[in-house]
Amino acid sequence: MKIAIAQMNCLVGDVAGNAAKIIANAIEAEAQGATLMVTPELSLCGYPPEDLLLRADFLDACEVALEKLSTAITNITVIVGHPHRVGEECFNAASVLQDGKIIATYHKHALPNYSVFDEKRYFTAGGEPLVFEHFGVR
């Protein structure tokens, strides 16, 4: 198994631009023989999104972009960092995109709340681990 780590300059609030960078990195990673690529934390929306997370239209745009990514990236498994809204709660999440769909989503457990980090203000802490299968490996 060859794993690629996408080192991207994600721009806060530029969901469409960040999605395009994720696709470009996935194409490059696949061309180099990777079967799995991991993107940075909140790569879809940029970090730290702060008060953008309080806007429903921003979260809607992230959801739409993630769905589009899942269908656009089909030949490599990609783990994408993004905000994930569930009801009234918002999670700092990472979703696994595989075979044209979202197969799993992880919610970050340990949210920092010091110095410039204020994640507890915006996110709910997750409570479950995530294990997924990739080419028969868990």
Where do the protein language model's features map onto the residues?
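Enzyme catalytic cores with a strong preference for nitrogen-chemistry domains
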Residues: M1-R138
